[in-house]
Amino acid sequence: MSQQHDDRRPPDTADRDLARQATSLAEKNERLTAALTAARAQLVEMKAQLEEVSKPPGSYAYFAAAHADGTADVYSAGRKLRLGVAPSVPLASLRPGQEVQLNEAMTVVAAGGYEPVGEVVTVKELIGSDRALVVGRADEERVVRLAGRLIGENVRVGDALTIEPRTGFVFERIPRSEVEDLVLEEVPDVAYADIGGLSSQIEAIRDAVELPFLHPDLFREHGLKPPKGLLLYGPPGCGKTLIAKAVATSLAHTAARRDADGEPAELPDGAARSYFLNVKGPELLNKFVGETERHIRLIFARARERASQGIPVVVFFDEMESLFRTRGTGVSSDVETTIVPQLLAEIDGVERLDNVIVIGASNREDMIDPAILRPGRLDVKIKVERPDAEAARDIFSKYLVADLPIHPDDLAEYGNDAATTVAAMIDRAVGRMYSTAPENEFLEVTYASGDKEVLYFKDFNSGAMIQNIVDRAKKHAIKDLLAGGRRGIRVDHVLEACVTEFKENEDLPNTTNPDDWARISGKKGERIVFIRTIVQKKSGETVGSVARAVENVATPGQYL
């Protein structure tokens, strides 16, 4: 018994051993758990990577249409397929031409955007609301579908669109600078009241343009058709372009008055009441055959589109002789033989040209093809003359106004009345410009018959010259103020500006062909064979003269 009692350890010692063993096992278990967790995470990560690299390739397609059974028609690799759609894809919100993603089972699993690149085609004709006839490379024509974001947009004939050739979808409108730069589509803010010295011409234009638009019922009652176009011709700088802009502004106001009288026109929000298509004539010419004619067709297609909404449209051809000169008169080319017929076909061809007014401006109307000038095309021909003394006063009053700073000495001379002072300035300036004194002699011309005539500066005056004179006077006043003088414009500033303007124009008539120069300047009649310029000092003393005869001048070649 005593021996057994000796072999036993105390209970507290055995418990401590068991506790140490349990703690050791727990620590090992934790380390094993952590290792297993890390291994499991690595396995999961490796499995994900393996799945990622072994995933079958996905493909993209273009959505075409949805069906009631939850399937969709798509174009994939040039083939049209009907595929299932995953529940996560909002089928009702997909639009034609939109990209969709397909999985390996050829199921639509995601929606994308629209193709941002592609070939460029030009719209030739719109077919319904979702199709168009376009022209591509080598003038190949095809019918295409408008992608979802183009449906309902203002797609026009002549617009450039990107296309995906295999599906036939067009996605995006691309700005074409070569077309947009040729036509300036704007609503001018020039009124007839802003034009001076052309009251008779303005009255003739209003009778020709505004009456048919304001009273179409009376014209129909009398069997009278409104004019299709008008020609403004005359010397440079006399207001032809300004009149054309005023016509567009006046038509806009006329349309607004007509709507107020009970004939409302349904226009899009923000749409203008008139459009002014300013065609840059020389830039319209293109070295490629048929391009100029195509641009003319696009211009009139745009005009018809605007006019179809009941909006008056003015198509303005400045420097008209550069585009539509008489057929057969070309020296180095014969482009006019096809350009002129294209314009004639647009003005009075099979397609009607309602609410569109064609206005041409030229200072060489003798070079324009007669077929364009005949009645039925450019019906009204209005000559814009050089201003006489009364017209010059009217033009001066548009630029030299009482609101400008006037010099105190000049104000004191006329009772401190700004309006009276300005009127006196204008009278002095007009008297200086239109004087037939020797200091105003400009040219001596000799006609083919041997007759001679002295021309004065007043014979070459224009509205642009008057505006330039007023601007010079303002500059003189500013320079005097900066030099330490008093503020304001003086009569002396205006008279000095007149003399400076005359001096700058003395050498301009020295051309190799005086007769052509005279025609452009508005001097028509017998052929001029000799020009002698009369050069003046500021005091009016003749200091010399320069003569030039047609027969004695070596004319350069046609390409120089």
Curated annotation (Swiss-Prot):
Residues 1-19 have a biased composition (Basic and acidic residues). ATP binds at G237, C238, G239, K240, T241, L242. Residues 16-55 form a coiled coil. Residues 1-21 are annotated as: Disordered. PROSITE patterns: AAA. One of its GO terms (molecular function) is ATP binding. Residues 559-560 are annotated as: Docks into pockets in the proteasome alpha-ring. GO terms for cellular component: proteasome complex. The keyword ATP-binding applies. InterPro entries: AAA+_ATPase (IPR003593), AAA_ATPase_domain (IPR050168), ATPase_AAA_core (IPR003959), ATPase_AAA_CS (IPR003960), NA-bd_OB-fold (IPR012340), P-loop_NTPase (IPR027417), Prot_ATP_ID_OB_2nd (IPR032501), Prot_ATP_ID_OB_N (IPR041626). The keyword Cytoplasm does not apply. GO terms for biological process: modification-dependent protein catabolic process; proteasomal protein catabolic process. Pfam families: AAA, Prot_ATP_ID_OB_C, Prot_ATP_ID_OB_N. Homohexamer. Assembles into a hexameric ring structure that caps the 20S proteasome core. Strongly interacts with the prokaryotic ubiquitin-like protein Pup through a hydrophobic interface; the interacting region of ARC lies in its N-terminal coiled-coil domain. There is one Pup binding site per ARC hexamer ring. Upon ATP-binding, the C-terminus of ARC interacts with the alpha-rings of the proteasome core, possibly by binding to the intersubunit pockets. Consists of three main regions, an N-terminal coiled-coil domain that binds to protein Pup and functions as a docking station, an interdomain involved in ARC hexamerization, and a C-terminal ATPase domain of the AAA type. ATPase which is responsible for recognizing, binding, unfolding and translocation of pupylated proteins into the bacterial 20S proteasome core particle. May be essential for opening the gate of the 20S proteasome via an interaction with its C-terminus, thereby allowing substrate entry and access to the site of proteolysis. Thus, the C-termini of the proteasomal ATPase may function like a 'key in a lock' to induce gate opening and therefore regulate proteolysis. PANTHER family: AAA-FAMILY ATPASE (PTHR23077), PROTEASOME-ASSOCIATED ATPASE (PTHR23077:SF144). Belongs to the AAA ATPase family. This is Proteasome-associated ATPase. It comes from Beutenbergia cavernae (strain ATCC BAA-8 / DSM 12333 / CCUG 43141 / JCM 11478 / NBRC 16432 / NCIMB 13614 / HKI 0122).
